[in-house]
Amino acid sequence: MSPGLQKGSRLMENRSPPSSFSIEHILGLDKKTEVASSPIIKHHRPWIQCNSEGVDGTFWHIPVISCDLPVQVHALRRSMGEETQVRLEKCCGEEDRLTYKRELSWYRGRRPRTAFTRSQIEILENVFRVNSYPGIDIREELAGKLALDEDRIQIWFQNRRAKLKRSHRESQFLMVKDSLSSKIQE
C-alpha cells in the first residue's frame, strides 16, 4: 500500500464520530447502528389502547376519545344511525385525562361563538361610531360593564372594522357599476 493511502486509511480510522449537526445525524441516518445496541424506548401515549393485533405482532388501536363531551362522527352516524362516543376514563387516570384533554383542544375545534345581546351590541356600536380603534383601557371598561371578556370585545371591534371595510368596498363597486351602466345606455 502506498504511503498516501496508508495515511488516508489512518485518518479514516482516527476520524471522530459525526457531529450532531451533520446531515446524517439530522436525518437520523447515523442511528442505524445505534438502534440495534440501544434499548427500546417506549413513549407515553395514553390515547393508544392495545387491543387489536398489528402487522408486526404488536397490539395498536387508536380510539376516538372524548373526556367529557361526546365526539360525533358524522359519516359514521349517517351509516350507523347513532352517535359514537368513547370515554377516556376507561383507559387513563385523572392526571393523564386532564393532560390529554388539553392536548386535544385543537381537535374539538374553535371556542363556541359569543352570543351578544341586543343591548351589548347597541353599546358596542355607539362606542364604534365614536372610536373604531378603542384602546385596552376602553375595552377593559366595556368588558366590565357588559360582562364580557376583553378579548371578545377586541374581536368584536376587529370584525366590525372588517364589516365596515367590506361595505365601503361594495358601495364603491356599486357606484362604479352604476356609472358604467349609465354610460353604456347613453
Curated annotation (Swiss-Prot):
Stored Pfam families: Homeodomain
Spell out the GO cellular component terms annotated for this protein, sorted alphabetically and separated by semicolons. nucleus
> PROSITE patterns this protein is in?
HOMEOBOX_1, HOMEOBOX_2
Question: In which residue ranges does the UniProt entry place its DNA-binding region annotation?
Answer: 109-168
**Which terms under GO biological process does the entry name?**
forebrain development; negative regulation of DNA-templated transcription; negative regulation of transcription by RNA polymerase II; regulation of neuron differentiation; Spemann organizer formation
Q: Where in the cell is it found?
A: Nucleus
| Matches recorded under Gene3D superfamilies | Homeodomain-like
Q: Main subcellular localization, coarse class?
A: nucleus
Q: Which UniProt keywords apply?
A: Developmental protein, DNA-binding, Homeobox, Nucleus
- Residues of the signal peptide: none
The record's CDD domains line, in alphabetical order, gives: homeodomain
- Which sequence ranges are marked TM in the entry? none
GO MF entries: DNA binding; DNA-binding transcription factor activity, RNA polymerase II-specific
Which superkingdom, per the lineage?
A: Eukaryota
Asked whether the keyword DNA-binding is assigned, the reply is: yes
Q: What job does this protein perform?
A: Regulates the earliest stages of development of the anterior neural plate. Plays a role in forebrain development by inhibiting the expression of otx2 and pax6 in the rostral region of the anterior neural plate. Necessary for both neural differentiation and neural patterning. Controls Spemann organizer development. May act as a transcriptional repressor.
Provide the assembly information: Interacts (via N-terminus) with zyx.
UniProt family annotation: Belongs to the ANF homeobox family.
Q: What is this protein called?
A: Homeobox expressed in ES cells 1
